[in-house]
Amino acid sequence: GPMGIMGPRGPPGASGAPGPAGEPGEPGQTGPAGARGPPGPPGKAGEDGHPGKPGRPGERGVVGPQGARGFPGTPGIPGFKGIRGHNGIDGIKGQPGAPGVKGEPGAPGENGTPGQAGARGIPGERGRVGAPGPAGARGSDGSVGPVGPAGPIGSAGPPGFPGAPGPKGEIGPVGNPGPAGPAGPRGEVGIPGVSGPVGPPGNPGANGITGAKGAAGIPGVAGAPGIPGPRGIPGPVGAAGATGARGIVGEPGPAGSKGESGNKGEPGSAGPQGPPGPAGEEGKRGPNGEAGSTGPTGPPGIRGSRGIPGADGGSRGATGPAGVRGDSGRPGEPGIMGPRGFPGSPGNIGPAGKEGPVGIPGIDGRPGPTGPAGARGEPGNIGFPGPKGPTGDPGKNGDKGHAGIAGARGPAGPPGFQGIPGPAGTAGEVGKPGERGIPGEFGIPGPAGARGERGPPGESGAVGPAGPIGSRGPSGPPGPDGNKGEPGNIGAIGTAGPSGPSGIPGERGAAGIPGGKGEKGETGIRRGAPGAIGAPGPAGANGDRGEAGPAGPAGPAGPRGSPGERGEVGPAGPNGFAGPAGAAGQPGAKGERGTKGPKGENGPVGPTGPVGAAGPAGPNGPPGPAGSRGDGGPPGATGFPGAAGRTGPPGPAGITGPPGPPGAAGKEGIRGPRGDQGPVGRSGETGASGIPGFAGEKGPAGEPGTAGIPGTPGPQGIIGAPGIIGIPGSRGERGIPGVAGSIGEPGPIGIAGPPGARGPPGAVGNPGVNGAPGEAGRHGNRGEPGPAGSVGPAGAVGPRGPSGPQGIRGDKGEPGDKGPRGIPGIKGHNGIQGIPGIAGQHGDQGAPGAVGPAGPRGPAGPSGPAGKDGRIGHPGTVGPAGIRGSQGSQGPAGPPGPPGPPGPPGPS
């Protein structure tokens, strides 16, 4: 075994006691001389004798000679100055030691004096809405490009899905719409989800097939002209009818041109200084969290005072073992901004965060117009994927058909009795203008007049401004199942779309409570091994493009149904997940031009019917000129945070230099102007604590610098290899939040490419599983009544109609002010009161006329406020055609108008 260590010397032992003295023996006989025996034991020591007399002093000795003096030694040669030593090589990483005792929380630093608040800048004037540009001329169709070469044969595709179900049965007749269900309870507001990454935009779909022109309606039979009756006594003016139901909101108009960007406002004053918060506990480093959405930039905090410098440490000892990380502490409140620390070395590039979870899908977009159901195409076999051809030219729109013949007027009612004309009166003098009369009370509403004949369809009005987004309507009865189309192939990933417009900067938040002074972190590893660059994954092959089935013939036009009553809006269903983008369809064939029908003869002018009830609100007229820009409204609510931006390429890490010796405390010089805000660096790993320096003198606060112009984002580069981990630097001051950039102009739409070559037919795909039916929509609130329509052109003067029934006498109105004296009329003969005629029957409804040509395109509306960075959803699929509603009931007759001023008396 190993040699032991020699122990210390023990203490000496105690002395033994002397033995007793022996007695003298008797003298023996002298014997022969024997052999010398062993020495006996020592005898008893004798007692001291008496002292003798002192002797004589000795003689003085001779003094010896003096020795020679030694020579002085030579001084030693001074040694050379030693060479200054270099920093030693980093020691081997020590084993992790036991967790240290938790230290006392550090004392919070002194609150710095709040800086002087800057003057509030004058807000810039709002930008004006730009005038809409002129509509561009229709471009000519491009030539069809050559067909590209066939691509290489791809690998075998994945296994197919389960088989397709059998064909659907015959489509049954459309049922009558059921009664509207009761309004469901209002759902609770859900938790806003985390915005997911923006998916790649899908391929733009080709233009749909132009529908065939409908057949012209059968002209109605012209009725026999009635005998004109006598002019009846005008009845009381009916009261104004109730406001009709709001019309269907039109499709949104084209987006207006972008307005000029407003002037940048001055930065606001800093918020008040908050109290210092408690010191947070030192926590362990948790796992890398998932990348969250980028929050709004908070306001800069108030600059705090410089902390008390620590004592000058001695020589640096050996690096101890790294302690175990503590538990993750609760995040502290944002602290007051401290003084600018000493610049540190650039930190190493951290790993990229995990991709955030897929956010909750956005609200479904407005359903597009219902297109005609195409005939089911024959499924083809799955072929080898061919190369993706360029996009085809859009098909031309077919010519609009001519308007059909308007229906003939119905038969006139029986004529009324002829009244006897009275004698004509003499003309009176012109009266002077009287004062305005007091309006009389409304009389009893008269009987509703007969419904007027339906006029010919008017021309389509100009596209009105975009109306408010309507609430979701109730779920209608399920329509007939259409023929199942062949499965589409997955399209190639489209190119990235242009960047969305920048959102409106949010309001400036209040300064947060400053956090306490945190504990000193553990010493990190100074240098780590660089990670290896991952191998790039194999690129996926583009899927083959399926063959489009032939377009089915358009079905015959069904009978025109009567409009139904407006149903209540059901509760909003859950947001569905965005489906995959469908493959672009083939452009449809150009429809044949319809033949112009024969022009019918003008029918005889019928008698004038009684005054009808107030009709429904007319279509929205063309939008008026853009009004002057109003005052700025209140700031809008902060939108959902946009998707997290992609991490840019990390810069190369610099070589870490050796730490220098601590410098002496120098005097702080004159503070220079504040520079432009630099880019925010990535946080480095926690490095070893450096030697504390001497505290410098606190200087005066500098003037705040102007914020730099925000730069445009550069293209994403290739992620470089991780750099060498450097000594982390101290955290610098938080920069002033940058001003949001102006909204960029939308880029021009690219020219559509020629259609690609048709690939081989694919195999029959397996049908997908039918999705679960969605929940019924939430009942919405009744919309506000729409604006009154523009006055239509005056109709032709009809013949005198039969006298209507005598109205009920209204209540006597209050006497009005004296009206202006009227022009004396010719004295008429007193006629006898006519007998009320029999009300005529309603004429048959005329055949619906053909759709007129489209009206001119209205001017572009003003551009709305830019939203936050939203996600562009996939284009929604065309929904099934809804059942035409039944015709609305006739509105009540309006109350009679106020009586007119009395005329002047005739001459006697």
From Swiss-Prot:
Compartment list = Secreted; Secreted, Extracellular space; Secreted, Extracellular space, Extracellular matrix
What biological processes does GO assign it?
extracellular matrix organization
Q: Where is the composition biased (Low complexity)?
A: 1-36, 129-158, 183-197, 234-249, 293-309, 403-418, 465-474, 526-542, 569-589, 602-617, 637-647, 701-730, 745-775, 785-805
* Keyword Repeat recorded: yes
Positions with biased composition (Gly residues): 627-636
Q: What molecular function does GO assign, one term? A: extracellular matrix structural constituent conferring tensile strength
State where it is primarily located.
secreted
Q: How is it modified after translation?
A: Prolines at the third position of the tripeptide repeating unit (G-X-Y) are hydroxylated in some or all of the chains.
Chain intervals with Pro residues compositional bias = 893-908
ATP-binding as UniProt keyword:
no
Which Gene Ontology CC terms are recorded? collagen trimer; extracellular matrix; extracellular space
Q: Give the Basic and acidic residues compositional bias ranges.
A: 45-59, 590-599, 809-820
Region Disordered: list its residue ranges: 1-211, 227-908
Tissues expressing the protein: Forms the fibrils of tendon, ligaments and bones. In bones, the fibrils are mineralized with calcium hydroxyapatite.
What the entry lists under Pfam families is as follows: Collagen (PF01391)
Alphabetized, the UniProt keywords read: Calcium, Collagen, Extinct organism protein, Extracellular matrix, Hydroxylation, Repeat, Secreted
Family designation = Belongs to the fibrillar collagen family.
Biological function: Type I collagen is a member of group I collagen (fibrillar forming collagen).
Its quaternary organisation is: Trimers of one alpha 2(I) and two alpha 1(I) chains. Interacts (via C-terminus) with TMEM131 (via PapD-L domain); the interaction is direct and is involved in assembly and TRAPPIII ER-to-Golgi transport complex-dependent secretion of collagen.
Q: What more is known?
A: These protein fragments were extracted from fossils. The tryptic peptides required multiple purification steps in order to eliminate contaminants and to increase the concentration of peptidic material.
What is this protein called in UniProt? Collagen alpha-2(I) chain
Source species, please? Toxodon sp
Taxonomic classification, please?
Eukaryota, Metazoa, Chordata, Craniata, Vertebrata
